[in-house]
Structure formats: structure tokens, C-alpha cells
């Protein structure tokens, strides 16, 4: 029997109606199954998904409704945002569909999936942390076009005098897209995103641990909030 390891533990709702489990794999697949299919599990367990691609593995599992926005982020710094309702629900033993292009697929940004988050509020933050200790905090946003402003809050205008418009937060894409750049990485030193988290409260604390066993504790507010998708963020470790 193949060796098994626990990947994720989540709590089940007493009333799972309208809730789903979302499974994200390292090669960019996402699978959505009704949470009710997992309410009764025997001691030997149940198959939750079948991997379509040899060598693929599970990265993350989230509980969500069709009202949630899903964001999948690759290790190379790209983010694919789409509605949970855009993904068709399937049975337990299905393999899912592509949520983001990664690896050597044509038009991809390379890498593998670093993480997946499910979010309800446009004012929640996504925190991305890189292998070499850079962190970036970005607001999810409404994905609508808004009037761009400078650091002082003054509106910006194009050369022809028309308002300069930008996307509020992360732009929505279709499932399976390459996505948009979410964090600029030091490619010369082969930096990559290793952790993706939602931040409901910027006064929360982060505990960062290195492979050598060194741990530091910082407030989320110590990370810099950035609206630009091509910025590196701040060094936290």
C-alpha cells in the first residue's frame, strides 16, 4: 500500500447544505464536491479525489459556497481568481478541472500551485510569503474598474484628460487561466512563493519558521499593503 500522509484537517458543518469542499493540486487542478458527500466516513476512509496526472498531489482543501471567490496562486507569482460558482460540482472520485495554468503548459507562468484561498469579502487580504523571506499583503478587491489615485489620494488622469482607471484588487479570470502577476520575485536567485494565507484582521500575528528551526513572530500590520501587482513586498525574515 502506498504511504499516506495527512495534508489538511478541516471542521465539518452540522448543516452542510450549499457548502462544498474544494481540492487544489500542485499541477493546477481544482475539484469541487458537495460537502454532504463527506458527512459519513467509515474507519477506512473514502476517496476524496482521483489524480488525473501522474505525479500530481494535493496542495490544499477549503470549504466554500458558490458565493466565495477562489484564488489559486503559483510559486512563480501568478494568481487566478474566479467564482466558486464557475466550477461545476462533481463526484468524489472525479479528477477536477484546471483552475490555473502552471508547469510547462503552453501560456503558463511555470512553477506549481503554492496555495488556494476562498474569500467572501472584498476587503479581506491575501498574504503571500516567498522562500527568501519577502511578504506581500494585497486586498482581494471587487475586481471592478475604479478611478486610480496617487499616494495622497488625488485622482490620476490620462494624457487626454480622461480618468485613469485601474482594477480594484485582483482581476477575475476564467478557471484554468495563467492569471495575473501578484508578486514580483527575485528570479536571479530563484525565489518562489511558498505560502498563501487569508488575513481577516491585520492585527493578527504571524509565526515564521525556517528549516533550521529559527522562529520569529510579527504583526500582520508590519507587512506592507501594496496595490501594485508587480511589487516585491517587504522583507520579514
What do the predicted segments below correspond to?
Residues 1-237:
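Short, structured "edge-of-domain" segments at secondary-structure transitions
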